[in-house]
């Protein structure tokens, strides 16, 4: 992303959440603020009837729908697990690379004692906070923590906040690892493992090697790679599940669950009339710290 502006891919993800909420029956993930969170350009597209009809046509639901499924599926999964974690006395929630997620307006009222930390690039945060304040009152339980993932660790960033290290925490890290070098992703997970309390949980999505994909999945992944390259946010990070598992287990994490695209589709998109499903190009990983 360019200095002084918010992430273009975060804007695109918000647009996909907005379209899914506004233009599908029985949305997998409901984000009534997503439309206002995205850019003027995306708002114009989502307000053009012909574009909306095309975006939600059967042929695009089978292609673009893979990307929509990825975006809304990961958010639904993370918040389902967060809800379970809070019931088991998790008291802190860290959104790593929070993007334009609207949790603080959508759901924070349901978790009045949950301390929320949004960690992201300062330019994305500045644009986001401006939009959030126009849409509603921010709860006192949220704190915005700036970070440059390539230059500092998450522990260094959270050390500047009210984050309590001895308190078990739920970390949600969505839509970010794809744009980071694999070493940066692993260093961030290692940093979490070193400073987070035992019992803390992490949910993240990650890309697999698109060279191993076939048909529309492979073409779609190549198309997304070209699109993000044009946005100046190229895809950099891919992992083999077995290699990633081995790396995080050495850090002290237990792999609770690693869902393939097919498993996510089975859980959240089964038998949908609109044929939206989750891509096979990315997976969802649930970790628990057990040092």
Question: How would you label these PLM feature ranges?
Answer:
Residues 189, 194-211:
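Conserved beta-strand signature within the Rossmann-like core of class I S-adenosyl-L-methionine
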Residues 267-291:
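Core SAM-dependent methyltransferase catalytic element
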Residues 217-234:
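Short, glycine-/aromatic-enriched active-site segment of Class I SAM-dependent methyltransferases
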Residues 154-165:
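Short amphipathic alpha-helix with an adjacent loop that forms part of the alpha/beta core around
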Residues 163-184:
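A short SAM/SAH-binding and catalytic strip from SAM-dependent methyltransferases
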Residues 1-94, 100-145, 153:
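Rossmann-like AdoMet
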Residues 235-261:
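Short alpha-helix
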Residues 142-144, 153-156, 179-197:
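A short, conserved alpha-helix within the catalytic core of class I
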């Amino acid at each position: 992303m360019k200095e002084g502006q918010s992430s273009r891919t975060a804007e695109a993800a918000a647009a996909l959440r907005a379209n899914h909420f506004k233009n599908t029956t029985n949305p997998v993930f409901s984000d009534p603020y997503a439309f206002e969170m995205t850019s003027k350009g995306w708002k114009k597209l989502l307000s053009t009837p012909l574009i909306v009809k095309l975006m939600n046509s059967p042929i695009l639901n089978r292609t673009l729908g893979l990307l929509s499924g990825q975006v809304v599926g990961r958010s639904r999964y993370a918040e389902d697990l967060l809800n379970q974690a809070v019931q088991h006395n998790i008291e802190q929630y860290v959104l790593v690379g929070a993007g334009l997620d609207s949790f603080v307006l959508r759901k924070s009222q349901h978790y009045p004692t949950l301390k929320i930390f949004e960690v992201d690039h300062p330019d994305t945060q500045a644009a986001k906070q401006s939009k959030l304040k126009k849409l509603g009152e921010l709860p006192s339980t949220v704190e915005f923590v700036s970070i440059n993932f390539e230059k500092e660790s998450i522990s260094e960033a959270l050390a500047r906040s009210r984050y309590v290290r001895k308190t078990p925490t739920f970390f949600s890290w969505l839509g970010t690892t794809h744009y980071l070098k694999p070493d940066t992703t692993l260093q961030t997970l290692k940093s979490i493992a070193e400073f987070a309390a035992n019992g803390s949980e992490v949910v993240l999505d990650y890309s697999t090697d698109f060279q191993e994909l076939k048909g529309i999945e492979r073409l779609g992944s190549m198309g997304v790679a070209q699109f993000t390259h044009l946005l100046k946010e190229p895809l950099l990070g891919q992992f083999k599940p077995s290699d990633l598992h081995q790396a995080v287990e050495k850090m002290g994490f237990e792999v609770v669950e690693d869902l393939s695209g097919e498993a996510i589709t089975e859980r959240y998109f089964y038998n949908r009339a609109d044929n939206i499903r989750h891509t096979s190009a990315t997976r969802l990983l649930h970790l628990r710290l057990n040092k």
